[in-house]
Amino acid sequence: MHNMLLFIIFHVVGDFYLQSDEVAKNKENLNTFMLIHSIIYSIPFVLLFIYFKINVSLLIIITLSHLLIDVCSVKLKNKYKEKECLIFCSDQFIHIFIIYLCSSYMNLTIILSNMALISILAILILVKPTGVLISLAFKVIFKEEKSNHELKIGTYIGYLERIIIFLLCIFDSISTIGFIIAAKTLVRYKDINNNKNHFQEKGL
């Protein structure tokens, strides 16, 4: 369990946090950016493998499989743009399955407890991966385009909100979550009135 959690944490860091917007965008063209992403993605695993002196063959499997899966995902996205959200979820599932298989061959001594690793993983997933998933879902449902400035502001606010709600859940402060939702609704009341159907659909 320790191994799998640690490997998934490194996967999330490499696939989402070490990938810049420029690399993510240009990856769609199947050019050198795809290779750049795979190399950068492998950095956390390289450090792990050096520290624990693990067989390098597993590192090669993780890196090459990641590159191959990403290439297939990009080709599918270019062909089936309306199914981008489903392809993203399938892509991540296969990545994690490969990582699970590789991690099962190792027995690492890790100081952190399972709960600590789960908490770290939960926060990491709640920020960028969840943001990407929500963005893809809205892209399918709502066809209009937003400015980069508006998207970035909304994205960062979403990051902060999810982290705050997660921490409040950990500290068993459920009532505060209700207060945050009520306060946000009050602040956005004007938007709800001005664009009733559209805004309410997104809010729900």
PLM-predicted stretches and their roles:
Residues R162-A182:
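Short alpha-helical packing/oligomerization segments
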